């Protein structure tokens, strides 16, 4: 029996995935990605490496933004965010994410919070890590019902896109050249 929990392993894996970045932004409802970012910062400090800037939306202690999402988007557009986390109610094999809902619009069977800024961040942040603790056919579908943010975009130059998908059971990497 290992001397660590599954969640501790996920947090350590997140820190490994973030290695080498200067600035990571984390959403308000993302405790494990935030813990992974803080673990990376602690590792860097112990190794006397450059301090990682962490922006956790909604946090008074770990957020240098005074106007939340607006400043995050400005910082991202200027190329000053190296990593970000996205999840989704549905995720498919092309790394498309659905944050809208399932079923036929406008009478969706399930409705999720929406996609505020997800496509923008997905296009511009160089290292987007898809994170979803649940690993099930309900989440991982052949094709998402709605594309809130596309994983890959043919014929479009974009610095961002999927870097990895981490679940409670597995770590997947992405090859943007393959669909």
Q: Predicted regions: what is each one?
A:
Residues 1-69, 80:
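N-terminal active-site beta-alpha-beta segment that forms phosphate/nucleotide-binding
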Residues 61-179:
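Conserved phosphate- and dinucleotide-binding cores of soluble alpha/beta proteins
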């Amino acid at each position: 029996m290992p001397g660590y929990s599954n969640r501790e392993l996920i947090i350590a894996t997140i820190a490994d995935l973030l290695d080498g970045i200067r600035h990571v932004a984390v959403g308000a409802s993302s405790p494990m990605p935030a813990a992974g970012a803080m673990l990376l910062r602690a590792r860097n400090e112990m190794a006397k490496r450059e301090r990682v800037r962490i922006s956790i939306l909604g946090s008074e202690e770990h957020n240098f933004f005074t106007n939340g999402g607006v400043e995050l988007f400005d910082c991202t557009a200027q190329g000053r965010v190296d990593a970000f986390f996205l999840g989704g109610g549905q995720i498919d094999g092309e790394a498309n994410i659905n944050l809208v809902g399932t079923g036929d619009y406008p009478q969706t069977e399930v409705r999720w919070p929406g996609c505020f800024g997800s496509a923008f961040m997905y296009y511009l942040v160089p290292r987007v890590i898809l994170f979803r603790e649940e690993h099930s056919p309900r989440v991982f579908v052949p094709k998402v019902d709605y594309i809130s943010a596309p994983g890959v975009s043919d014929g479009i130059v974009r610095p961002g896109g999927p870097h990895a998908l981490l679940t409670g059971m597995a770590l997947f990497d992405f090859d943007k050249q393959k669909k």
